[in-house]
Each structure stands twice: as structure tokens, then as C-alpha cells.
Amino acid sequence: MTLSGQSSIKQRPLVIGLVAGETSGDILGAGLIRALKQMHPNIRFVGVAGPLMQAEGCEAWYEMEELAVMGIVEVLERLPRLLKIRKDLTQRFTQLKPDVFVGIDAPDFNITLEGRLKQKGLKTIHYVSPSVWAWRQKRVF
């Protein structure tokens, strides 16, 4: 023990697993990475990331664009690849055992992944930006 009460044994840096599947998630994820790096400079981020998250230091196992699908036809065309990615991520995160997994928005992909990781004993968080549904002017006020 040191005088500050901290153990002098070297601890591994925090490891955070992240998955963002769209541009809005990349923006949120980059901000999260920046904020956490201020508190923990040696923190490590791994997972599925876009260019902004990668610029902040996230190691991308897959590019965010691989998850960005819209419409039933595109989803069906890419479903085998999406399922393979989710299976691979489940295995990789389970093996790595990050301190926490953060699914950033993209609920169609992340909610199932988060459930599987929880079953494996990992801590998970689903991180989304608040949204306002104001389709009519009177809902804004």
C-alpha cells in the first residue's frame, strides 16, 4: 500500500467495449470516449466504431458502416453478415471480459448483444441520446 491508500500493485487499464451502428451513435460514442479519457487517460476502447470514435482512439474490430442498414430489403440482404458479426462480438467480448460493454443506440443490434453478454456475466449499459418527438408544433411547447 502507498501513503494514499492505493495499492502499489500495477492494475490493468480499464477496458470498455463499444458498439455504435450509425452516425448518431458515432457522435455519442466519440463524446463518451473523450469524457472517459479525461478521467482515465490509460483507458482502452474496443468494438464497432465509426470514424469519430476511431479518431478518439477506439480500436475498431468492425467498421460502423457494416451495421448501418435501413429498410427491410437491405436488412434481409445483409442479415447473414449481421448475425455473424453479432456472434463474433459475443465471443470476443466474452473472452476479453471488458469492465463494461456500452451499446450505443442501434437497439435492433445492441439489445440482443447486450442480453447475451449479460448472460455471460458482463456488465452492460445501453447509451442513447434523449430524443424529442415533436411532429406537431403544439408538442414542442
UniProtKB/Swiss-Prot annotation:
PANTHER family: LIPID-A-DISACCHARIDE SYNTHASE, LIPID-A-DISACCHARIDE SYNTHASE, MITOCHONDRIAL-RELATED. Condensation of UDP-2,3-diacylglucosamine and 2,3-diacylglucosamine-1-phosphate to form lipid A disaccharide, a precursor of lipid A, a phosphorylated glycolipid that anchors the lipopolysaccharide to the outer membrane of the cell. Its EC number is 2.4.1.182. Belongs to the LpxB family. This is Lipid-A-disaccharide synthase. The gene is lpxB. Keywords: Glycosyltransferase, Lipid A biosynthesis, Lipid biosynthesis, Lipid metabolism, Transferase. The keyword Transferase applies. Pathway: Glycolipid biosynthesis; lipid IV(A) biosynthesis; lipid IV(A) from (3R)-3-hydroxytetradecanoyl-[acyl-carrier-protein] and UDP-N-acetyl-alpha-D-glucosamine: step 5/6. GO terms for molecular function: lipid-A-disaccharide synthase activity; phospholipid binding. It comes from the Bacteria. InterPro entries: Glyco_trans_19. It catalyses: 2-N,3-O-bis[(3R)-3-hydroxytetradecanoyl]-alpha-D-glucosaminyl 1-phosphate + UDP-2-N,3-O-bis[(3R)-3-hydroxytetradecanoyl]-alpha-D-glucosamine = lipid A disaccharide (E. coli) + UDP + H(+); a lipid X + a UDP-2-N,3-O-bis[(3R)-3-hydroxyacyl]-alpha-D-glucosamine = a lipid A disaccharide + UDP + H(+). The keyword Transferase applies. GO terms for biological process: lipid A biosynthetic process. GO terms for cellular component: membrane. It comes from Proteus mirabilis.
